[in-house]
Structures are given as structure tokens and as C-alpha cells.
């Protein structure tokens, strides 16, 4: 009895949109059309949009230029010897002179003494090459044996 009354109340209180099986889709579409147009009323869609966009682009370019200038000034400090390098490279008077430097050149004689890594690499290459040749030879041998067995 209680169940019948709950079902009857459900049918009586159910509207076409809330809980009923007949849903009017066209009515819902008409309600949702043009509801959110106010959120698009900004300066980006008005006459002033060109001025705003130009100002934004100008600020962005200025910021990028400032960053580039700061990076160059930080890198071109005294420790990099930028002016000294420019003089050595671009002055004609320094072509005959040798430039003095406190850095020692790379000495190749020390490299010749370390021959052990080269020996190890050559042994490894020899073993790898031998393994490849052995596996190719073994593969051909097994193919030939299987071909002979199938012919018999």
C-alpha cells in the first residue's frame, strides 16, 4: 500500500523535464541560446583591440630586449676577457705578434703514453668480429644440414 502511494505521488509530481520520459529537447536548446554573450564583451573584440594588441606586443618586445641585454652584459664580464679577445682577433698589429696567455696548450705526448685503452678496444673489436663470423658460419651450417635431411 505504501509502495503504491509512493509510485502515485511520483507520477503526479513528475513534470515533462524532471523525471518524465517525454523530454522536450527543442525547449532546452531555446533556453541555452545566447546566455553567455556578456562574457565575450571585452576589449579584444571591440574597436580598441588593435591598440591593445599593439601595446601588448610592444611590452613583450621591450621585455625580450631587456632580457637579451642583461644576458649579454652578464656574460661579457671581466673574467671572459672579451675586450682582450677582440683585440687579438681584429687588430692588424697583433698578426705579427704572439698573444700571451696563462693557459697551457694541449700536450699530445701524454696521450701517446696511454695506449692500454686502445689495446682493449682492438681486442674487443676482434672478439666481436669473430663472434659475428662464427654465428654466420654456424647458421649456414644448420641450414645446409636441415636442407640435406629434408631431401633424404
From Swiss-Prot:
<dbReference type="InterPro" id="IPR018920">
    <property type="entry name" value="EssA/YueC"/>
</dbReference>
<comment type="similarity">
    <text>Belongs to the EssA family.</text>
</comment>
<dbReference type="GO" id="GO:0005886">
    <property type="term" value="C:plasma membrane"/>
</dbReference>
<comment type="function">
    <text>Component of the ESAT-6 secretion system (Ess). Required for the secretion of EsxA and EsxB.</text>
</comment>
<protein>
    <recommendedName>
        <fullName>ESAT-6 secretion machinery protein EssA</fullName>
    </recommendedName>
</protein>
<keyword id="KW-1003">Cell membrane</keyword>
<dbReference type="Pfam" id="PF10661">
    <property type="entry name" value="EssA"/>
</dbReference>
<feature type="transmembrane region" description="Helical">
    <location>
        <begin position="115"/>
        <end position="135"/>
    </location>
</feature>
<feature type="topological domain" description="Extracellular">
    <location>
        <begin position="136"/>
        <end position="152"/>
    </location>
</feature>
<keyword id="KW-0812">Transmembrane</keyword>
<keyword id="KW-0843">Virulence</keyword>
<feature type="topological domain" description="Cytoplasmic">
    <location>
        <begin position="1"/>
        <end position="114"/>
    </location>
</feature>
<keyword id="KW-0472">Membrane</keyword>
<dbReference type="InterPro" id="IPR034026">
    <property type="entry name" value="EssA"/>
</dbReference>
<keyword id="KW-1133">Transmembrane helix</keyword>
Amino acid at each position: 500500500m505504501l509502495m503504491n502511494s509512493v509510485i502515485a505521488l511520483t507520477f503526479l509530481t513528475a513534470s515533462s523535464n524532471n523525471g518524465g520520459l517525454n523530454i522536450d529537447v527543442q525547449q532546452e536548446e531555446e533556453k541555452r541560446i545566447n546566455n553567455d554573450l556578456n562574457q565575450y564583451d571585452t576589449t579584444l573584440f571591440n574597436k580598441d583591440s588593435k591598440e591593445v594588441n599593439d601595446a601588448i606586443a610592444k611590452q613583450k618586445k621591450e621585455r625580450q630586449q631587456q632580457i637579451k641585454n642583461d644576458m649579454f652584459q652578464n656574460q661579457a664580464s671581466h673574467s671572459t676577457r672579451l675586450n682582450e679577445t677582440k683585440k687579438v682577433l681584429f687588430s692588424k698589429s697583433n698578426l705579427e705578434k704572439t698573444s700571451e696567455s696563462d693557459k697551457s696548450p694541449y700536450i699530445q705526448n701524454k696521450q701517446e703514453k696511454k695506449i692500454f685503452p686502445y689495446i682493449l678496444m682492438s681486442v674487443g673489436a676482434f672478439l666481436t668480429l669473430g663472434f659475428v663470423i662464427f654465428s654466420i658460419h654456424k647458421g649456414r651450417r644448420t641450414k645446409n644440414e636441415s636442407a640435406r635431411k629434408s631431401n633424404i
